[in-house]
């Protein structure tokens, strides 16, 4: 089978989860992605065949980049067609992002069994373009806003083995002892979290602050100033552009402060941790708000819109969780109830069913 995924953790982590499941079922798995996506392939099983393909986006870059984009995509489609003729996949699964265009387009032209998985509550641009050109759509967030006449199947968002192994891990509620707070802005970090979270934490009462240890994922360009701010304000913090061990840190955390990308919400709910979610306001179709809504309504998270995410507002919410162990425990339990640890297996069954149907036609 072939998996195609775009260049962010939001696309790559669920793709990794499916690769792990399909390899365990005895499948040969190939992944196609771009150079950005290749940064996230370190966690994929070693037996996954990984190929970087030519693709481009119309959403970023200047006029020159937009002129070149169709030619890059066309070259990627041609390469995918040639590759599929040499090694015909039984099924092609796209996880969104521009790097999935070549594989999905080639699968459409060759009439191969094909499907997409949409992690968010709103279809991304590429998944929207292919929604009526695939055999099935798996949805990670429910309900998902789908084009008229298009049906989706709710599988949930698959999570990596490292997350699944920690499903409903025991939660230590906040108290007068060392506490962990994890701050993650998605796989690419988030500037607003680097702007508002450090002063919010630094303003907490000293009795609470002395117990806190912060793990803060910040962008490369923000790392130094964030680390300096924490140090100057007496906050124990580890600041890195990317944590390879997020599953461990999330499991040990009393509170997680995060964007509400679909993968982050899935990880939080499978492990079961209280969270403060700050949806990315510029996300396509405001899909991060849609992603957060279910977990918030279930009682597992607090949502703070980006427009209201001041240091004062965040400090109040952080304090409300860490100063109330009973409420924090209830949030952790609610998050775990909301989780769908079976999502990976459901998606794997869907993939196998589609491949089987393709063999009969």
Swiss-Prot record:
Q: How does it sit in the membrane?
A: Peripheral membrane protein
Catalyzes what? di-trans,octa-cis-undecaprenyl diphospho-N-acetyl-alpha-D-muramoyl-L-alanyl-D-glutamyl-meso-2,6-diaminopimeloyl-D-alanyl-D-alanine + UDP-N-acetyl-alpha-D-glucosamine = di-trans,octa-cis-undecaprenyl diphospho-[N-acetyl-alpha-D-glucosaminyl-(1->4)]-N-acetyl-alpha-D-muramoyl-L-alanyl-D-glutamyl-meso-2,6-diaminopimeloyl-D-alanyl-D-alanine + UDP + H(+)
- The catalytic activity of this protein is classed by the Enzyme Commission as 2.4.1.227
Q: What does the UniProt entry say about where the protein is found?
A: Cell inner membrane
What GO annotations for molecular function exist for this entry?
UDP-N-acetyl-D-glucosamine:N-acetylmuramoyl-L-alanyl-D-glutamyl-meso-2,6-diaminopimelyl-D-alanyl-D-alanine-diphosphoundecaprenol 4-beta-N-acetylglucosaminlytransferase activity; undecaprenyldiphospho-muramoylpentapeptide beta-N-acetylglucosaminyltransferase activity
Q: Which residues bind UDP-N-acetyl-alpha-D-glucosamine?
A: 8-10, 120, 160, 187, 288
Q: Which Pfam family is one of those matched by this entry? A: Glyco_tran_28_C
The question of whether Repeat is a record keyword is answered with no
Output the SUPFAM superfamilies linked to this UniProt entry.
UDP-Glycosyltransferase/glycogen phosphorylase (SSF53756)
Annotated GO biological processes are: carbohydrate metabolic process; cell division; cell wall organization; lipid glycosylation; peptidoglycan biosynthetic process; regulation of cell shape
Q: Which residues form the signal peptide?
A: none
Coiled coil start-end: none
GO annotation, cellular component aspect: plasma membrane
Kindly provide the name given to this protein in its UniProt entry. UDP-N-acetylglucosamine--N-acetylmuramyl-(pentapeptide) pyrophosphoryl-undecaprenol N-acetylglucosamine transferase
- Natural source organism: Roseobacter denitrificans (strain ATCC 33942 / OCh 114)
Q: What is the lineage of its organism?
A: Bacteria, Pseudomonadati, Pseudomonadota, Alphaproteobacteria, Rhodobacterales
Instruction: Tell me the name of the encoding gene.
Output: murG
